[in-house]
A protein has these predicted regions:
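Non-catalytic, conserved peripheral segments adjacent to functional cores
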Residues: 1-105, 126, 133, 138-182
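Conserved metal-binding segment of the jelly-roll/cupin
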Residues: 102-125
């Protein structure tokens, strides 16, 4: 297992070591010990899974403290463009976004720390996404940023006029008006 740092501090791509042969493959998607050896000490408490059709866009979501979540995101089937936006007001990369292609084929994962908004778009026919969280869902602390905020200039890999977006996500504020407490 190895970690690929991004230009945003604390936001990392995790690449597992895959063992393959004529039968298929095996890999550890998460090991508390190996993560700790890599300097990542997180106690995950909840796993979430979603299934989405091509053109679906989910996000950008976050939870405010004290229920802020770190997420470890991976794709079980299909392909997504996974996006994280830095909401930490004291960070030199505040308001900057990072995106990465996650797929069942490349087996990469994105570790999204507390203080970030997270979302993804589905670019394959369907996608199953699983993510581990270090805090439970708390409706009262949820927040979000509109996916098409022009100041973020995110390339979702699709025509946004055709995107399948929930009503809830369509009415989220731009980053300048979000209720982030980070």
């Amino acid at each position: 297992m190895k970690i690929q740092e991004t230009f945003i501090k604390d936001l990392v791509v995790v690449e597992p070591t895959v063992f393959g042969d004529e039968r298929g493959y095996f890999f550890e998607s998460y090991s508390k010990t190996k993560f700790k050896d890599l300097g990542i000490d997180i106690d995950f408490v909840q796993d979430n899974q979603s299934f989405s059709k091509k053109g679906t866009l989910r996000g950008l979501h976050y939870q405010n403290p004290p229920f802020a979540q770190t997420k470890l995101v991976r794709v079980l089937e299909g392909e997504i463009i996974d996006v994280a936006v830095d909401l930490r007001k004291d960070s030199p990369t505040y308001g900057k976004s990072f995106s990465v292609l996650l797929s069942a084929e490349n087996k990469k994962q994105l570790l999204v720390p507390q203080g970030f908004a997270h979302g993804f778009s589905v670019i394959s026919e369907t996608a199953s996404v699983m993510y581990k969280c270090d805090q439970f869902y708390n409706k009262a602390s949820e927040g979000g940023i509109k996916f098409d905020d022009p100041s973020l200039n995110i390339d979702w890999g699709m025509d946004l006029k055709e995107a399948i977006v929930s009503e809830k996500d369509q009415i989220l504020p731009f980053i300048e008006n979000c209720n982030s407490l980070f």
